[in-house]
């Protein structure tokens, strides 16, 4: 009960103060409140303007980052392909020498092909080589069908052109000859 009585007294005191103020004091009090409200509004307005400027800067920075990402997205891919180009150039130079043999040229081409395929795999490109597998119309395109006794129907007999996927998505289907 003591707490309740003291709370009632506190509630009455502000009312008494407000009633006991002179008009001049009321005016001064209201002016002070107005000044504080105006200052608070000004501070909030400044915060809003800074936030808007920060958002504009963020938009510009993000737009520039996206532009750079588009420009240089293939940078590492191109650098990796240059390795393959260098290998081809060395192969051509070697093939032009008088002592070059067909065997050496073929070995060089096979090595270059391996480098090329490993470069593609680094970037998520996987070769589809479906020889002796069942024909899959989602990954393979039948060039022709040949009756072949002793082979399962709809199995791939020969790969005419390899297919490729990029990160699991088909880029080019494998062109195949299928057993009928």
Swiss-Prot record:
Enumerate the UniProt keywords alphabetically: Chaperone, Cytoplasm, Stress response
Q: Which InterPro entries match?
A: GrpE, GrpE_coiled_coil, GrpE_head
**Stretches assigned to coiled coil:** none
In terms of Pfam families, this protein maps to: GrpE
Q: Where is the composition biased (Basic and acidic residues)?
A: 1-12
Extract one GO molecular function annotation from the record.
protein homodimerization activity
Which parts of this chain are annotated as the region Disordered? Answer: 1-31
Instruction: Check the record and name the PROSITE patterns matching this protein.
Output: GRPE
Q: Which example biological process does GO assign this protein? A: protein folding
Write out the similarity annotation: Belongs to the GrpE family.
Q: Matching HAMAP family, A to Z?
A: GrpE
Cross-referenced PANTHER family: GRPE PROTEIN (PTHR21237), GRPE PROTEIN HOMOLOG, MITOCHONDRIAL (PTHR21237:SF23)
Q: What is the role of this chain? A: Participates actively in the response to hyperosmotic and heat shock by preventing the aggregation of stress-denatured proteins, in association with DnaK and GrpE. It is the nucleotide exchange factor for DnaK and may function as a thermosensor. Unfolded proteins bind initially to DnaJ; upon interaction with the DnaJ-bound protein, DnaK hydrolyzes its bound ATP, resulting in the formation of a stable complex. GrpE releases ADP from DnaK; ATP binding to DnaK triggers the release of the substrate protein, thus completing the reaction cycle.
Q: What is this protein called?
A: Protein GrpE
* GN (gene name): grpE
